[in-house]
Amino acid sequence: CLSRGLGDVYKRQIIITFRCFLMIGRVPSESMEPTLMVHDWLIGDRHAYEEEKPQRGDIVMFYQKDENETMVKRVIGLPGETVSFVGGKVYINGEPLDESAYLDDTVETDCGEEDKTFTVPEGSYFMLGDNREISLDARYWKHTYITTDDMKSKEILIIPFHRLPWF
């Protein structure tokens, strides 16, 4: 009976430790496809940005004020940069952004307005979904930019349970 009680204590301790350091989320929409598919599970590091700053390309879970919900998007624009959209491509400070590490060359990005430019304030970040045709992201939010205070975790693991044959 004592060993069973200790087992419960250890289980609780593991859960508490896990929740303090990691965040679990589930992808609710197609906005990050093909990188993240609907119903994929994510594990994120809650403390990733305490010592380091977000980097372009990071996938982040964050609180979005306009939608009053937690979202998952990719960091595109860094503090002090200008982000613009020309001919279906993303430009950072006037240079085309190489997104080949995570997007197909055929992906087009626009804002509904050609040549729209955003200047990212200090301490803020510009976020986009990978599925640019349908993603509700910084191009359309009233509160365009996200701060590290809004960021809940940096994604460190994608678990595609629904795509695995034994689930």
What does each model-identified segment do?
Residues 3, 29-31, 135:
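Short linear Ser/Thr-Pro motifs
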Residues 1-13:
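Single conserved hydrophobic/aromatic residue that forms the stacking wall/gate
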Residues 34-167:
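Soluble "head" domains of membrane/secretory-pathway proteins
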Residues 16-32:
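Aromatic-capped interface at the extracytoplasmic side
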Residues 11-14, 29-31, 142-146:
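Intrinsically disordered, low-complexity boundary segments flanking structured domains
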